[in-house]
Amino acid sequence: MTQIIDGKALAAKLQGQLAEKTAKLKEETALVPGLVVILVGDNPASQVYVRNKERSALAAGSRSEVVRVPETITQEELLDLIAKYNQDPAWHGILVQLPLPKHIDEEAVLLAIDPEKDVDGFHPLNMGRLWSGHPVMIPSTPAGIMEMFHEYGIDLEGKNAVVIGRSNIVGKPMAQLLLAKNATVTLTHSRTHNLAKVAAKADILVVAIGRAKFVTADFVKPGAVVIDVGMNRDENGKLCGDVDYEAVAPLASHITPVPGGVGPMTITMLMEQTYQAALRTLDRK
């Protein structure tokens, strides 16, 4: 029987544990983890993500500030704003909500964030730490998925893992984290030949390709663990993932739903990384 991986319930459990750790930290050291989110423009999806992050920070007992700036902000002004928060010890995590307007160089912005405050884990230094086997800041979505594997007792060692999608946000760091747990990893993408055939060999299938219901039953071998990172709208405007849930769920041993699967875990892990970043400031004193 297929087991549904309830990301919403797991995120709530971890958030409760994080709130306890944060309260203890505040009591013992007077330190309160602080996350600042910079939102450029008024993209509706970004507004939703930012509100969710605000709520999660509040639930975890952390401080949060959302800095909303107009879409017309220059790159220089945005970099100056980041520099201000880099230098402010009251803030332990800095997140610039993506995507950014076309006139702003995304790479330059990510490079400008202090790697010790880069709770998204997108700075090249943090990417390098991850790939060298010494991670400090890990992109939140892959980190959340690894926590799901742990909580649900899913053993990765020696398993065939296939990741569909090669982004720096999910696909590449996901592959490295699986590799670190001794899985045999195949990183695929939209141009992989015979993709369904490759995916059908997976014991662990992580899908992050950004196409509604892209993965159908012929991609999945019976008993596979299926993790759906996608967040799309179907032809009726209903939220759906990259996996055709109705077709795939009966085949899987474990599967994440959309919504209520990976999404809540992503935000919870972001708060955990903000807490860990705050702890590291104590080590540096």
From Swiss-Prot:
Cellular component, GO annotation: cytosol
EC annotation from Swiss-Prot or TrEMBL: 1.5.1.5, 3.5.4.9
PROSITE patterns assigned to the protein according to its UniProt record, in alphabetical order: THF_DHG_CYH_1 (PS00766), THF_DHG_CYH_2 (PS00767)
Keyword presence, Hydrolase: yes
Gene Ontology BP annotations: L-histidine biosynthetic process; methionine biosynthetic process; purine nucleotide biosynthetic process; tetrahydrofolate interconversion
Positions bound to NADP(+): G165, R166, S167, S190
Keyword Hydrolase: yes
UniProtKB keywords: Amino-acid biosynthesis, Histidine biosynthesis, Hydrolase, Methionine biosynthesis, Multifunctional enzyme, NADP, One-carbon metabolism, Oxidoreductase, Purine biosynthesis
GO molecular function, one term: methylenetetrahydrofolate dehydrogenase (NADP+) activity
Gene3D superfamilies hit by this protein: Leucine Dehydrogenase, chain A, domain 1 (3.40.50.10860), NAD(P)-binding Rossmann-like Domain (3.40.50.720)
Reactions performed catalytically: (6R)-5,10-methylene-5,6,7,8-tetrahydrofolate + NADP(+) = (6R)-5,10-methenyltetrahydrofolate + NADPH; (6R)-5,10-methenyltetrahydrofolate + H2O = (6R)-10-formyltetrahydrofolate + H(+)
Pathway connected to this protein: One-carbon metabolism; tetrahydrofolate interconversion
PANTHER family noted in UniProt: C-1-TETRAHYDROFOLATE SYNTHASE, CYTOPLASMIC, C-1-TETRAHYDROFOLATE SYNTHASE, CYTOPLASMIC-RELATED
Family: Belongs to the tetrahydrofolate dehydrogenase/cyclohydrolase family.
Subunit (UniProt): Homodimer.
Function per UniProt: Catalyzes the oxidation of 5,10-methylenetetrahydrofolate to 5,10-methenyltetrahydrofolate and then the hydrolysis of 5,10-methenyltetrahydrofolate to 10-formyltetrahydrofolate.
Protein name, as recorded: Bifunctional protein FolD
